[in-house]
UniProtKB/Swiss-Prot annotation:
Name assigned to this protein: Putative uncharacterized protein YhiL
Disordered: annotated span: 1-34
Compositional bias (Basic and acidic residues): 15-34
First and last residue of the signal peptide: none
Length: 535
């Protein structure tokens, strides 16, 4: 939506006509008199002293004017019922038509998630009409015929996106096409756009004409990093008009990285919200390639991380799911050769993890239904490579294999050295946790973790075994060719790899923090995407 300056137009309190009850800011310190049952209630701006109580329409208006909820204990609980425990139900195309002024009316419905509650909440429909410099807003939750007439200059248009982005249905569609650029032009675009950003300066070379698997480590919630991985591996393309938008997206993620380092969370969230608005525009220029031959494995911590939002995470997961060999993916034109694994951030966090830790409500919505389809490990029998986010070890004392908070006792396996059987059991155990309704409620911040799940979440994050133990585990496992040991590739706490990595080591840790040596030969860390493909 075209920007509207956040200015307040003063309207005389003495003015009143037969069509409206006018409520000025100073009058609105008290409750709106709904007993009057007027057709239209008009006012300029709500402030911190406004008593809006259980009025859903007024809560919406306050958010649109201020960019956040009116904070008090009661409203916090109501937001959880209305938005944060709701099903994705808003059509983003309808929002875009309203934002582009193609239509002056926008109707959306919030459908509360009633799967795990005793008292059912009814869907709430909100109608917004923009006309003559005013917004006319009505909510079915008001249980009255009141329509609020709000000065358009008091509402910040971008706050519509901030309010609703987490509740957009994850039903993006992508055209399927062939690359229209020459190889030279495509390579030039990729280099000119990504080489300016520190996060991509040390990436290993990925050849989209090579059928060897490309591995990608932690991306920390950066949408740009997932787009980069899919671009260089030949799975997606971007039409010419989209590259300038991609530059803007990357610039905002880089500024968000700086805000994160300086612990300026308000700036971080604002930048990520703007990033998502840019992504919403960029989407129309992204297409899937029908001739991708390079298998890709994403090793986890791509969502639920420091640069995540619900909107960005849903986009990443929906895009990746279109290329996965998974139930429900019926698009035969796309090579289903992308594997996406869950890391501790996917498992533990819904949306931005710094916001969730602070119980800060950055945006509504839930990524659970997309996350729960992910496995935690994958075994490639052809290449004899075992991949996971954490790396798998053997605990001889406890007589089990360990992956994050999961354990597989040796005696639960038909063949205790079979890597494929081991991967299947780990994935089955992971799915049992993800399917637990209690797990879902805790992950969405609806309930505090039980002691058992608090321990589970902690162990999922804190599991950082030594490289030697991961290597020994690979030596113990036996594939179809017992003369070759099983190689492991993982993310999480790995030392990271850069463009100098030439050999396919027995173990490879592809973290976004890379170990390096300073002039005094001390280990230092730099942030950057780790990726590897054998050439």
């Amino acid at each position: 939506m075209k920007a509207i300056d956040n200015q307040i137009r003063n309207i005389s309190s003495s003015h009143q006509d037969k069509h409206s009850d006018k409520v000025n800011s100073h009058q609105h310190h008290g409750k709106v008199d709904k007993t009057h049952r007027a057709k239209i209630v008009e006012f300029d701006k709500l402030d911190n002293d406004s008593q809006i109580d259980n009025d859903f329409g007024l809560h919406i208006i306050y958010f649109l004017q201020h960019g956040h909820w009116k904070v008090n204990d009661r409203s916090h609980q109501m937001e959880k019922v209305w938005f944060y425990n709701s099903e994705p139900s808003i059509d983003i195309q309808e929002y875009n038509r309203f934002a582009d002024n193609t239509t002056d009316t926008f109707i959306f419905t919030i459908i509360p998630d009633n799967n795990h509650v005793l008292k059912l909440s009814s869907p709430i429909t909100v109608t917004v009409e923009c006309k003559g410099g005013y917004y006319f807003i009505n909510s079915s939750g008001d249980k009255s015929d009141i329509i609020y007439k709000v000065d358009g200059l008091s509402i910040i248009a971008r706050n519509f996106f901030t309010l609703l982005s987490g509740n957009f249905k994850p039903d993006w569609r992508w055209d399927v096409s062939k690359e229209t650029f020459t190889k030279e032009k495509f390579d030039s675009y990729v280099k000119s756009v990504f080489s300016k950003i520190d996060f991509y300066k040390q990436c290993g070379v990925i050849n989209p004409q090579n059928a060897n698997t490309a591995y990608f480590g932690d991306t920390d919630g950066r949408v740009g990093a997932v787009l980069y991985a899919l671009l260089v591996s030949g799975h997606i393309g971007i039409r010419e008009k989209g590259w300038s938008l991609l530059c803007e997206l990357l610039k905002h993620e880089e500024m968000a990285s700086s805000a994160y380092k300086h612990k300026n969370n308000k700036v971080l969230y604002d930048l990520l919200n703007t990033r998502d608005m840019i992504l919403n525009e960029l989407h129309q220029h992204v297409f899937l390639k029908d001739d991708a031959i390079t298998p890709c494995i994403f090793l986890g911590d791509h969502t639920g991380d420091r640069f995540s939002t619900i909107f960005g995470d849903k986009y990443i997961l929906t895009l990746l799911n279109s290329m996965r060999n998974m139930e429900g993916n019926k698009d035969s034109r796309i090579n289903k050769n992308v594997v996406v694994l869950a890391g501790n951030h996917e498992i533990n966090f819904n949306g931005n993890y710094t916001a969730r830790l602070a119980n800060h409500k950055l945006s509504a919505g839930d990524t659970y239904n997309l996350i729960k389809t992910l496995d935690v490990c994958n075994y490639d029998s052809e290449r004899q490579v075992l991949t996971s986010h954490h790396g798998i070890i053997r605990d001889e004392e406890k007589k089990c294999y360990c992956l994050g908070a999961l354990q597989v006792p040796f005696n639960q396996m038909k063949n205790p050295t079979d890597p494929e059987e081991l991967a299947n059991i780990f994935n089955k155990k992971h799915k049992e946790h993800m399917d637990d309704p209690l797990f879902h409620l805790i992950r969405s911040n609806t309930l505090k973790p039980t002691p058992v799940y608090a321990n589970y979440f902690d162990n999922t994050t804190d599991f950082r075994p030594a490289r030697e133990r991961i290597f020994i585990c690979g030596e113990t496992l036996k594939g179809e060719d017992p003369s070759k040991y099983i190689r492991q590739k993982y993310g999480h706490h790995g030392p990271g790899v850069d463009h100098n990595q030439q050999f396919d080591n027995g173990i490879m840790g592809l973290n976004s923090l890379k170990e390096a040596r300073d002039k005094n030969n001390k280990i230092i860390y730099s942030s950057g995407l780790s990726c590897f493909q054998l050439h």
